[in-house]
């Protein structure tokens, strides 16, 4: 081998981690979809908080299924449900969950949009929104469930208990999805390209 022959240099980025631009964009789209769902849930809760008297026909539709599943001894009347509704409003459960999810949906919308454009700050905004939704959603659902435990009976009690669990699970999933671009190395590199690492060659 010719000693004067130049030695081929190893590319500095041969073993570098490649950025993944598709992952953060996919997460952004999922967060936008979740933001729309949260917005409609928040809109419904805020509407319930502002509704002093429920329509008898609407209450009848709500009670039709649970009352039909019992033997008639534990049927819930329209007046009982209205009493529960008033207690849930006075507890602040509807308001806490509604306005909390509204803030969460706005932050998820902004954060998801920023992730689509590969802005790393969007993941942090979305994660904070999901955390707010998780806390306020569970707390508000527990307040509503407490009112249900006091004034309702039968199948509806299970319904409001399941709602609490579902709210917590959905918001925990949103938080997990929002955190993915911050945890995954390739996704984080796409969001923060200035942190790219190169392999250094030292000549002997």
Model-identified regions with their sequence ranges:
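Topology signature of small-to-medium multi-pass alpha-helical membrane proteins
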Residues: 2-204
């Amino acid at each position: 081998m010719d000693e004067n022959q130049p030695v081929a240099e190893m590319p500095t980025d041969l073993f570098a981690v490649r950025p993944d631009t598709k992952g953060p964009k996919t997460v952004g789209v999922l967060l936008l979809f979740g933001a729309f769902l949260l917005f409609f849930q928040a809109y419904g809760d805020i509407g319930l908080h502002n509704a002093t008297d429920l329509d008898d026909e609407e209450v009848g539709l709500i009670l039709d299924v649970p009352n039909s599943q019992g033997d008639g001894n534990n049927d819930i009347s329209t007046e009982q449900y209205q009493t529960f509704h008033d207690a849930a409003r006075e507890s602040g459960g509807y308001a806490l969950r509604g306005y909390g999810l509204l803030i969460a949906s706005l932050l998820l919308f902004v954060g998801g949009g920023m992730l689509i454009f590969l802005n790393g700050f969007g993941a942090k905004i979305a994660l904070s929104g999901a955390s707010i939704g998780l806390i306020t959603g569970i707390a508000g659902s527990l307040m509503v469930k407490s009112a249900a435990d006091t004034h309702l009976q039968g199948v509806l009690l299970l319904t409001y208990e399941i709602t609490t669990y579902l709210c917590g699970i959905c918001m925990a999933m949103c938080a997990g999805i929002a955190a993915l671009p911050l945890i995954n190395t390739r996704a984080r590199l796409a969001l923060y390209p200035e942190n790219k690492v190169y392999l250094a060659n030292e000549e002997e």
